[in-house]
Amino acid sequence: MIAFILMFIISCFLGPDGFTSFLYIFLSSYVGHVVLHDDLFYYLPYSILHRYHHEIHSPFSYFINILSELSQLTLALFLLPLNPWSMLYGALMFVTIHYINYSWLHINTYHEKHHENVTSNMSPDIIDVVFGTKHPDTPFFEDTTHMIPNVILCALFVFWLKQYYTPSWKRYFCYISSILILLLSTTAFIIKNKT
């Protein structure tokens, strides 16, 4: 729980709308994950890539899923007036915790329980508690102390980047994001046709 509190405190220093933007990404990561597992959205490119992540555990599937998750945030930045620093901070938090802590280091069984039952442990943990999607074999509140290095290092990186940001980056960010989304859509199409 301490890591979540620390995340929200840090988000307050990312700008006047930092907290609300981080709250948005916190809630949307849960809702987005639920949507990715819903049959109604089975053929969306992001759902195809996410299913691939569940079925095949390889460096390629991790890489594609990381790109997919980061590109989803670029769509939100184009459509909603959110704080880009909070969005970047939230994205880095999600990706580093999901892939480094859970998938590579296997800090606990929280994420593995989600792979056993895709309707449980959608994450973040506190949201699973609120919506009743906690896996019955996981503690009511996850010990989040393993997230503290991620929280601190991601915050330092975002604050450093914010200090050296120039407005011309936005144009390049849009170009790169567009190419990334095109790449992911093409990859999803290829994976769908192979399965």
Predicted regions and their residues:
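Early transmembrane hairpin module of multi-pass membrane proteins
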Residues: 1-11, 16-45
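Hydrophobic core of alpha-helical transmembrane segments in multi-pass integral membrane proteins
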Residues: 2-12, 73-79, 91, 95, ...
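Transmembrane helix interruption/hinge and helix-loop junction motifs
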Residues: 14-21, 78-88, 161-169
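Transmembrane alpha-helical segments that form the membrane-embedded catalytic/substrate-channel core
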Residues: 27-45, 88-110, 159-164, 180-194
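Membrane-interface helix-loop junction between the first two transmembrane segments
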Residues: 35-56, 169
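Membrane-proximal soluble regions of multi-pass membrane proteins
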Residues: 43, 101-142
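Juxtamembrane helix-capping/reentrant segments at transmembrane boundaries
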Residues: 47-75
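Membrane-interfacial alpha-helical segments at the cytosolic side of multi-pass membrane proteins
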Residues: 71-84, 122
